[in-house]
């Protein structure tokens, strides 16, 4: 089925848009962008050069995907932002592309990024994660699958979070978090196992 694209959206003619997408008025899509099938792009979304998006994604108002990295080392290299399939990316989210030539910022499949989340350059998030309201993930982090970040979590640069970890609200951490643990506090401490996943 052909995509439904508002004539009030600003889309570079070089951008590749899949089938059965709906793009609302005032969306902004640059030329070096690929969007798969069955995606919904709401008003005032900006999708920048280097973004490669799979199928079934829904992007809400005022989100920016593929923004220039907030990194003093960035010198204009050609880099990418990879978004997988069936992600739900809510309002006011910012996802930065990578810093160095050939680099990628990656969001996998079936993730839920709530309002105001930020994913910085070169970070890689696997599948089925939740980023709570206002959660900020700094550059070069690695996040496993089925991780839940509660509201207003701050993940400092180069941290790694294992599969199915649960991070409590307001946690600020710079060290690695093992799989299947509940972590919280500043400084971060471990508060047991994620029994919801393990049961």
What is each residue range found by the language model?
Residues 3-184, 188:
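Structural signal for interior beta-strand "rungs" in well-ordered beta-sheet cores
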